[in-house]
Amino acid sequence: MSSDSRHKSKFDGRIGLLKIFAGVINPSEKGEIPLTLNVHGTIVSGMMIGMKPYYEQMGKIFVDAIKRSSPETVSVAKKEFKMVFDKIKEPPNPKELEDGEFEFNHIFMRNAKIYNAIQVIPYRGTTYWIGKIESVDGFFLGMIHPLET
């Protein structure tokens, strides 16, 4: 047996299990799972949420950020933003899900904390994060809660 065949597997349980989680949580408006991911050596810990709540919150954050702009800029930005997010925030229809025609490839998180070697980013506040399932090297159910110093 060559060394290549020993290290390659057609089934990647890590990816398969995360896709199952995504298939349950992403179309949900209320479902969530505490999750910690290793993404190329960086730890990301937070609450996995559905795509619709994720995009709704991103929209609110964006609108709040542009409120200080001119009314014309705000109006155009809101219209364009709404058009884009209306298309992407809605999960696939139940028939597509039943027939297995739709595959979820991303994880959406709320209260995400990113851990590097020396600090937690962000230190405070609510952060929304999105990442590709294929980029995940490992994970566990549950969140890391940083110690207060």
What does each model-identified segment do?
Residues 2-149:
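Conserved RNA-binding domains used in RNP assembly and mRNA/RNA metabolism
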